[in-house]
């Protein structure tokens, strides 16, 4: 019996050791994982450092490019100012264009009122007697063939307007007569 009790004791001892050994192994496995975590963190840190240095390089390069572009722009401004060529500002051009448009509209209104007043026939008769006079356009240029064509078109338009206005006037007189 002593042999059976010893055998039972040895088996119990082996079972207890296994039971105790498995939590220790799990603890060692956890500790080995914990030790690998800092290693992984170190590796991640190294890759982060690499990324940071790449970002620093690209950031420095971007700053260099911006500074270079600014220097090129300043150099271009200085060169364009030295050339002495007259520069035209957009605001001046817009103002000039607006004034020109206004003057052209005013000239067209004056021309139509001149045609309506009937002075056109009298002046053209005087011109044919005295010879052609050089008239100037609003902007100071001499009258060209295009302006002469436009004048004749305006005269035709005026005559058409006069003819249609007289027709409506005759119809009013006819209605009053009846």
Swiss-Prot record:
What are the subcellular locations of this protein?
A: Secreted
Does the record carry Secreted as a key word?
A: yes
Signal sequence extent: 1-21
Single GO BP term: response to starvation
Q: List the disulfide bonds.
A: none
Q: Which is a Pfam family this sequence falls into?
A: Hormone_2
Provide this UniProt record's keywords sorted from A to Z.
Cleavage on pair of basic residues, Hormone, Secreted, Signal
Major localisation: secreted
Residue stretches in coiled coil: none
Q: Which domain of life is it from?
A: Eukaryota
Any one GO MF annotation of this record: hormone activity
Q: Which Gene3D superfamilies match?
A: 6.10.250.590
Q: What triggers production of this protein?
A: Produced in the A cells of the islets of Langerhans in response to a drop in blood sugar concentration.
**InterPro entries assigned:** Glucagon (IPR015550), Glucagon_GIP_secretin_VIP (IPR000532), Ppantetheine_attach_site (IPR006162)
The cross-references to SMART domains, in alphabetical order and at most eight, read: GLUCA
Q: Which GO terms describe its cellular component?
A: extracellular region
Propeptide-annotated positions? 83-87, 123-134, 171-178
Presence of the UniProt keyword Secreted in the record = yes
Q: What is the recorded function of this protein according to its Swiss-Prot or TrEMBL entry?
A: Promotes hydrolysis of glycogen and lipids, and raises the blood sugar level.
Q: Which family does it belong to?
A: Belongs to the glucagon family.
Provide the protein name. Answer: Glucagon-1
Which species? Answer: Oncorhynchus mykiss (Rainbow trout)
Q: Which gene encodes it?
A: gcg1
């Amino acid at each position: 019996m002593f042999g059976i009790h010893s055998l039972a004791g040895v088996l119990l001892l082996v079972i207890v050791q296994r039971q105790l050994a498995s939590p220790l192994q799990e603890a060692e496995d956890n500790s080995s994982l914990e030790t690998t975590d800092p290693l992984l963190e170190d590796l991640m840190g190294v890759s982060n450092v690499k990324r940071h240095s790449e970002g620093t390089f690209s950031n420095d390069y971007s700053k260099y490019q911006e500074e270079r572009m600014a220097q090129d722009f300043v150099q271009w401004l200085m060169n364009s100012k030295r050339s002495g060529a007259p520069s035209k500002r957009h605001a001046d051009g817009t103002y000039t264009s607006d004034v020109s448009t206004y003057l052209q509209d005013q000239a067209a209104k004056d021309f139509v009122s001149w045609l309506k007043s009937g002075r056109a026939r009298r002046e053209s008769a005087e011109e044919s007697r005295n010879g052609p006079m050089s008239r100037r356009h609003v902007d100071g240029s001499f009258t060209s063939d295009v302006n002469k064509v436009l004048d004749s078109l305006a005269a035709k338009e005026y005559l058409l307007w006069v003819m249609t206005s007289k027709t409506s006037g005759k119809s009013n007189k006819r209605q009053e007569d009846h």
